[in-house]
Amino acid sequence: MFRVLFLMLTLLVGLVAGPYISGQQGYVRIETANRIIEMSITTLVIFFIISLAIIYAFEWGVTRFFRLSRSSYQWFSNRKRVKAQKQTLEGLVKMDEGDYAKAEKLIGKNAKHSAEPVLNLIKAAEAAQQRGDEFSANRYLIEATELAGSDNLLVEIARTRILLQQNKLPAARSSVDSLLEMARRNKEVLKLAVEIYLRSKAYQALDKILDNVANSGLFNDEEFKDLRSKTENGLLDEKMNEEGIDGLLTWWNQQPRHRRNNIELKISLIQRLIDCNDHESATELTFEILKKLGDNTAISLPLCTQITRLQPEDNSKLLKLIEKRAKRVDEKQKCCINRALGYLYVRNNEFIKAADVFKNVIACPEQLEQNDLMMASYVFEQAGDKALAEQVRQESLKSVMAIQDVIPESAEEKTEENSTALLESKSE
């Protein structure tokens, strides 16, 4: 606009000043080696104005051309972006429908032209993995890494998840370790870490992140309690298998107080000690639990079960403690505590006392365990009450036969139903 105004003003000045200098304008002489050019000043001014007009027109044409090129480029780019967005949405729908091959094609085809190319490549990798194409999944992840960088949290989470789906536990373990260094409190990272550590039985690593898992809110109280129990029991097995009983007990004594005071975990430790024939240590821990529980706290069924397995050289202290509790036990605990007491009497060959407590055990038919009747008949026989032993043995056989009769009856009912259905289909 300014240039056009400049040209118009120049022409206007020429038109106004022309008559005043008419006849006095003189001339201009331009001399070169081979040529001489002479013209009036007016002609020179007109030539200068025309030259400027040509230059300005050329500049305008070039600018216009480049503007058209940029507009064309933007138009094609917008078209590709809109197409990529449309294909991404269609691909996500196909992914939800389970058509992973179509989803991968739609999401990954124009991924680089989408609004978030890294997300598209990650989703394409997940779709490829779902249909079992590990090569394509890894290729998409490599492209996503090139775009986002090697330390991108989103890409690394997707890589770890896909490694887990490929069942490459060592690689997934290494990847999740790196993720925990990048984002230790990230919920998705913690969720992956829990799953990978459980599947790879890396209980020590899982134990280190339990506090963060508890604070993350990933699990409710019951689920987290179950996770902690699995972790701690896994640690017991790990230490027992790697370092033996001595290493297990040394590790146990080094644990924090809240863990050593965990009754359920201590019962699990007793079970492992008995499995390894360390009945003395198991008896000592059992005695500690009973002393800590006191007289008014009920004994759990798992603890009673482990007491029946104990075979220490001297069980007198434990026996006195359980005898004291058995005198004031309620009906719910009657069967459990008498069973434990009876087995301790049997270990000491005190069959008369064992017979008395086993009478209390078989008086609770709803709480009987599989071997209770067999053990009771053995005790009664050793105590000299052969009639009662035979009666209990007959009841045991009847219960076994009753259980065996239930299975054929259910099988016959199914056979009759199938045959009836077959006859109906033939009649049709």
Curated annotation (Swiss-Prot):
Recorded metabolic or biological pathway in which this protein acts: Porphyrin-containing compound metabolism; protoheme biosynthesis
Cellular component terms per the entry's GO annotation: plasma membrane
Stretches the record annotates as Disordered: 408-428
Cell compartments where the protein resides: Cell inner membrane
Stretches that traverse the bilayer: 4-24, 36-56
One of the protein's GO biological processes: porphyrin-containing compound biosynthetic process
Keyword Membrane belongs to the record: yes
Keyword field: Cell inner membrane, Cell membrane, Membrane, Porphyrin biosynthesis, Transmembrane, Transmembrane helix
Organism superkingdom: Bacteria
Pfam families: HemY_N
NCBIfam families to which the protein is assigned, alphabetical: TPR_hemY_coli
Protein name, entry field: Protein HemY homolog
Gene designation per UniProt: hemY
